[in-house]
């Protein structure tokens, strides 16, 4: 008798598979990932159903930022050592991770203003503005602001970690040093500047990047590095834009729980660029 698609077994047979049913002393999946701790970390402070969504979205974001910091720290070390191959791979991974951070806002956007207002008071003054990992990313990418360190004074370890990042060369600072080592003309004061201060765009740096693009065939790794940096900057701007629109959708123009102006504060960051010359030269290429 002929058989059709609905006559097939409704399950995958495991009889011929070498499944390890008895793990013995070996770690299980849950033990390796410490899922007991991870899944016990969602502790709503209200009885509202939607608070769980709010907590998980932010915890997932922090996990992705943890990975980004892991990759970015390693990429910085590689750039310092003129080892661009691994650095490019790490920066590409960061870019992919950023896309996950961006789509997280789509999940949070399923929450209505009414649903959020039902538990908002439970947050007190806590805010994403206080995220240590987010601020570290901003600093490592080059958006330095000493005022942001003060938010973490109550946690000495976090305060010192952020202070070190503030005073250390950012990814872009290290990339400019790399360009200098490769023979491109970078102003000397840019190589030894006070790294705790915000970066200021330079015509000479823009000229160096133009040289990288015009001589891509002789230094493809630098050309690819430039485009990787643009990817990161572009994705960060998309993340900020999605953040703003999600906040606007859920709370309108109310002040944020951290004391900022909410949407009006977030709007100020939309035009920030970590690597300004890489955007400026596009008009003249």
Residue ranges and their predicted role:
Residues 2-285:
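Surface-exposed peri-terminal alpha-helical interaction modules
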């Amino acid at each position: 008798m002929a058989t059709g698609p609905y006559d097939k077994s409704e399950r995958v047979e495991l009889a011929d598979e070498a499944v390890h049913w008895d793990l013995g002393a070996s770690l299980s999946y849950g033990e390796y990932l410490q899922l007991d701790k991870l899944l016990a970390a969602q502790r709503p402070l209200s009885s509202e159903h939607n608070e769980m969504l709010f907590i998980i979205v932010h915890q997932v974001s922090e996990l992705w930022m943890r990975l980004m910091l892991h990759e970015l720290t390693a990429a910085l070390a590689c750039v310092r050592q003129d080892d661009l191959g691994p650095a490019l791979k790490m920066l590409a991974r960061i870019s992919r991770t950023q896309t996950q951070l961006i789509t997280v806002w789509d999940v949070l956007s399923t929450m209505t203003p009414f649903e959020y207002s039902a538990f908002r008071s439970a947050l007190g003054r806590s805010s994403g503005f206080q995220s240590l990992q987010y601020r570290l990313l901003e600093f490592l990418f080059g958006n330095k602001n000493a005022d942001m360190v003060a938010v973490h004074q109550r946690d000495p370890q976090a305060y010192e970690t952020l202070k070190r990042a503030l005073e250390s060369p950012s990814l872009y600072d290290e990339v400019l040093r790399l360009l200098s080592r490769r023979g491109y003309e970078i102003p000397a004061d840019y190589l030894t500047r006070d790294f705790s201060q915000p970066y200021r765009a330079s015509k000479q740096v823009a000229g160096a990047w133009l040289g990288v693009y015009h001589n891509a065939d002789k230094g493809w790794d630098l050309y690819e590095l430039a485009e990787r940096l643009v990817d990161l900057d572009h994705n960060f701007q998309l993340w900020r834009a999605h953040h703003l629109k999600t906040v606007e959708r859920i709370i309108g123009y109310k002040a944020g729980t951290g004391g900022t102006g909410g949407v009006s504060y977030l709007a100020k960051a939309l035009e920030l660029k970590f690597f300004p010359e890489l955007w400026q030269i596009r008009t003249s290429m």
